[in-house]
Design a protein with these regions (language model features):
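Conserved ABC ATPase "signature" region
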Residues: 129-148, 398-416
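ABC ATPase NBD coupling module
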Residues: 64, 78-95, 121, 243-248, ...
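A short, proline-enriched helix->beta-strand linker immediately N-terminal to the Walker B motif
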Residues: 172-176, 440-444
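Conserved ABC transporter NBD signature motif
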Residues: 64-77, 339-347
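Conserved ABC ATPase signature
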Residues: 152-157, 161, 421-425, 429
C-alpha cells in the first residue's frame, strides 16, 4: 500500500549552553494511506519532537538534523523545504492536534473566529459558509450549545472543551494526514470514546492517515493499525498492534504493557472529616440588560454536599462542563459560592488574613495544564521552591535546595532539572514538576486536577504509587478530579459522580465501580476504554 509519510534515518539534536542533546536518534517509520500509526513511550522519549519535526515546528536556531535525515510527505521533502511548500502543507494537507490547547489557542480571539479563519484561508469559504461549517464541527465534537459557544473565548471554556475546539480546528480542512499529540488528554471517557470514533469515521470517509502520539495503551490497542515504541530517542520495537500486544519482544515494551493502572484502592473511610461542603451553589452571570444588571445565570453547581476525610482520597468524576472544576475552585476558596465550606473545623469564607495564609499552605493543587501554570521565566528549582519562600521563609538556601531536590527525586525527575526551564521539559515532566511543587509543603489536602493526564503509563503508575505512599507517610488527603476512571479507581476511597451541576451518585469506590445504580454512572463506566 502507498505510504503517505516516510521518515528515514531521522536524527535531531538540540544545542543548549554549549552542549548537544540528542532527542531523536536515527529512527525510521512509514505511515500508510488511510491507516493509523501510534508512537508510544515515556515522557522525553522523543515522540513529540518527532511529531513537531514533520511540520518543522521545532525552534529555529537550536535544532540540527543530520545530513542523512529525511521526512517525506508524498513526494515532498519537508526538511529544509521552502516556506511556500510548508504553508501549503500546514493546516491543510497536514493538521496537528496539540497536547495543551490553552497554549495553542489565541486567548484574544473567539474560538469560532479561529476555526472560521482556517476555513476561509484554506477552503476559500465565505464568512457565512465558514461559520456554518464551524458550528457543524462543534456539534460533531460534542460542544454543548455550539451556536453560543462559538462566540466564547478560550478562557471561558473548560479544559476538555478547549481540547475539543482544537480537534475541530484540525479536522476543518479534512487533512490527508492528522498528527494527534495526546489529543484526548483532557477529555472525560464518554467524550474521549466519541471523539476517537469520530476520528475513525472521518478516516474511513476521507482516507485520512493518522499519526497518534499517546501514553494510553488502551487507545493504541483499540484505534491503531501499527505501533512504534520509543525509548530515549530510539524506536526499540515496531509492528502491527496485535503482534506487539500479544507477543512483545523488547523488555521496555513489556514494561509498558504491565504498567496499565487498574488495581482497586483499599478503603479508608473511618478517618475524621477534613473538609465538608454543604449546599454549595455556584452561579455565573451570562446575560445583562441595557442597564448592566445581570438578568440570566448559569447554575454551574447546584446545592452540592461533599465530604473529604483525612488521609483518604475522594474522587470526583463527570463529563466536561459538569461542574467538577467549579466545585473544586469553591472548595479552594477562589470561587464565590453560596453554602458552607468547612476545612479543618473552620469556615473558609470567614478566615482572617493569617488564617487564609495557613489554609493556602494546607490546601495545595496540581493543575490540569502544567505548561500554563509554570512560569516560563523561572527555573524548575525556583518553581518548586516558590512555596517554601512564602510559607517557610526562615529556611536557609542550602536547606531549601535540599528540599527541592528531594521533591524532584520523589517525582522521578533528575536533580539536573533544577536549573532547567519548563520549555526544556516534555509535557509529562512538566506535570511532575507541578506535583513536586504541591507536595514540597506537605499539605493536609491536595487537589489533583487530572494529575496523570500528561504522563505515559509507566510514569503514571510510578506517580500513582508515589501519591499513595505520600498519603500513607504524611497523612495526606486527596481530592482527585479525573476523566480516567482507572486512575480514580486506583486512588479513590470514595467517589462522587457529577452531571449538570449536581451529584447524581456517590459511594465507596468498590460499590460504585462494581454496582453502579444510576444510568449515567453506568454510561461513564461503559465508555471507559478498558
Amino acid at each position: 500500500m502507498d505510504k503517505i509519510l516516510k521518515i528515514n534515518n531521522l536524527v535531531i539534536d538540540f544545542e543548549s549552553n554549549d552542549s548537544i542533546f540528542r532527542a531523536v536518534d536515527d529512527i525510521s517509520l512509514a505511515i500508510e494511506k488511510g491507516k493509523t500509526l501510534s508512537l508510544v513511550g515515556e515522557s522525553g522519549s522523543g515522540k513529540s519532537v518527532t511529531a513537531l519535526s514533520i511540520l518543522q515546528l521545532l525552534p529555529e536556531g537550536t535544532v540540527q538534523y543530520s545530513s542523512e535525515s529525511s521526512i517525506k510527505f508524498e513526494n515532498d521533502e519537508i526538511i529544509a523545504c521552502p516556506k511556500k511548500t510548508l504553508s501549503a502543507l500546514r493546516g491543510n494537507k497536514i493538521s496537528m492536534i496539540f497536547q495543551e490547547p490553552m497554549t495553542s489557542l489565541n486567548p484574544y480571539q473567539k474560538v469560532g473566529f479561529q476555526i472560521d479563519e482556517t476555513l476561509i484561508i484554506h477552503k476559500k469559504l465565505t464568512s457565512k459558509q465558514a461559520r456554518e461549517k464551524t458550528i457543524d464541527l462543534l456539534k460533531k465534537v460534542k460542544i454543548p450549545e455550539p451556536e453560543r459557544k462559538v462566540d466564547s473565548y478560550p478562557h471561558q471554556l473548560s479544559g476538555g472543551q478547549r481540547q475539543r475546539i482544537m480537534i475541530a480546528m484540525a479536522l476543518a480542512n479534512e487533512p490527508e494526514l492528522l498528527i494527534a499529540d495526546e489529543p484526548t488528554t483532557a477529555l472525560d471517557v464518554t467524550v474521549e470514546k466519541a471523539l476517537l470514533e469520530l476520528l475513525s469515521d472521518l478516516q474511513k470517509e476521507f482516507g485520512m492517515s493518522i499519526l497518534f502520539i499517546t501514553h494510553d495503551l488502551n487507545i493504541v490497542k483499540r484505534f491503531s493499525d501499527e505501533v512504534c515504541v520509543m525509548k530515549e530517542g530510539k524506536i526499540v520495537e515496531s509492528g502491527k498492534v496485535k503482534d506487539i500486544f500479544d507477543d512483545p519482544k523488547h523488555p521496555y515494551t513489556i514494561k509498558l504493557l504491565n504498567s496499565i493502572p487498574g488495581k482497586k484502592a483499599e478503603l479508608n473511610l473511618e478517618n475524621e472529616q477534613l473538609l465538608t461542603g454543604r449546599k454549595v451553589d455556584i452561579k455565573y452571570p451570562i446575560a445583562k440588560n441595557i442597564f448592566g444588571k445581570t438578568v440570566d445565570f448559569l447554575n454551574a453547581v447546584k446545592k452540592v454536599d461533599i465530604t473529604i476525610r483525612s488521609g483518604s482520597t475522594t474522587g470526583l468524576v463527570g463529563e466536561s462542563g459538569s461542574g467538577k472544576s467549579s466545585l473544586a475552585r469553591a472548595l479552594l476558596g477562589i470561587e464565590k459560592a453560596e453554602g458552607n465550606i468547612i476545612f479543618d473545623g473552620r469556615n473558609i469564607q470567614q478566615l482572617n488574613s493569617s488564617e487564609t495564609r495557613r489554609f493556602k499552605k494546607d490546601f495545595q493543587i496540581v493543575f490540569q495544564d502544567p505548561f500554563g501554570s509554570l512560569s516560563p521565566r523561572m527555573t524548575i528549582g525556583e518553581i518548586v521552591g516558590e512555596g517554601l519562600r512564602v510559607h517557610e521563609p526562615s529556611l536557609i538556601r542550602s536547606e531549601r535546595e535540599k528540599k527541592i531536590i528531594k521533591a524532584l527525586e520523589d517525582v522521578e525527575l533528575d536533580k539536573s532539572s533544577f536549573s532547567r526551564f519548563p520549555h526544556e521539559l516534555s509535557g509529562g515532566q512538566r506535570q511532575r514538576v507541578a506535583i513536586a511543587r504541591a507536595i514540597i509543603l506537605e499539605p493536609k489536602l491536595i487537589l489533583l486536577d487530572e494529575p496523570t493526564s500528561a504522563l505515559d503509563v509507566s510514569i503514571q503508575m510510578q506517580i500513582l504509587h508515589l501519591l499513595k505512599d505520600l498519603q500513607s507517610r504524611l497523612g495526606l488527603a486527596f481530592l482527585c478530579i479525573s476523566h480516567d476512571l482507572k486512575v480514580i479507581r486506583f486512588l479513590s476511597d470514595y467517589v462522587y459522580v457529577m452531571k449538570d451541576g449536581i451529584i447524581v451518585e456517590d459511594g465507596t469506590s468498590e460499590d460504585l465501580f462494581e454496582s453502579p445504580k444510576q444510568a449515567y454512572t453506568k454510561e461513564l463506566l461503559a465508555a471507559s476504554l478498558s
